[in-house]
């Protein structure tokens, strides 16, 4: 289980009790400048700065007691935004047919970075069309994926 999984299991119940959706989290280690970023959402209405503040206070209290990260870090609570990161297969499914940007931990067909339409989502991977070529990318290799906002 990754650190992010442990943090999600620890925080999800509280965040959902507060009326928000736990969208995901990222831990960005950088010595004493490390960051724990928690993304929350609320169906149809989104989240406000005040919402992020309320959740941040609750999360901070839980993290202080449970202490899953031994190093110093900065806590950020945020909306996923228009370029929302994707963490779970059901999130990918919700954005099937839209443009995404994906970075993998190891090459898939010679590439580690992809930007194109996510044409298919299965239980184990996604298919992204880049410049007319289809790439099947296993979830296990995805380091980061974001929806590309359309204007």
Swiss-Prot record:
Question: Which GO cellular component terms are attached?
Answer: cytosol
User: This protein's superkingdom?
Assistant: Bacteria
List keywords of the entry alphabetically.
Cytoplasm, Ribosome biogenesis
Subcellular location(s) per record: Cytoplasm
Q: Which residues form the signal peptide?
A: none
Family statement: Belongs to the RimP family.
**What biological function has been recorded for the protein in this entry?**
Required for maturation of 30S ribosomal subunits.
Q: Spell out the protein name for this chain.
A: Ribosome maturation factor RimP
Q: What is the lineage of its organism?
A: Bacteria, Pseudomonadati, Pseudomonadota, Gammaproteobacteria, Thiotrichales
């Amino acid at each position: 289980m990754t650190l992010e999984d442990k943090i999600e299991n620890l925080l999800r119940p509280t965040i959902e009790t507060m009326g928000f959706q736990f969208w995901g989290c990222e831990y960005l280690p950088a010595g004493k400048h490390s960051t724990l970023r928690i993304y929350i959402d609320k169906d149809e209405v989104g989240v406000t700065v005040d919402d992020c503040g309320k959740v941040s206070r609750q999360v901070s209290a839980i993290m202080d007691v449970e202490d899953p990260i031994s190093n110093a870090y900065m806590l950020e609570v945020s909306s996923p935004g228009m370029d929302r990161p994707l963490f779970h297969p059901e999130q990918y499914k919700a954005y099937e047919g839209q443009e995404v940007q994906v970075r993998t931990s190891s090459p898939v067909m010679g590439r580690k970075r992809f930007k194109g339409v996510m044409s298919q989502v299965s239980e184990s991977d996604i298919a992204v069309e880049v410049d007319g070529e289809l790439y099947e990318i296993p979830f296990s290799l995805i380091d980061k994926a974001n929806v590309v906002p359309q204007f």
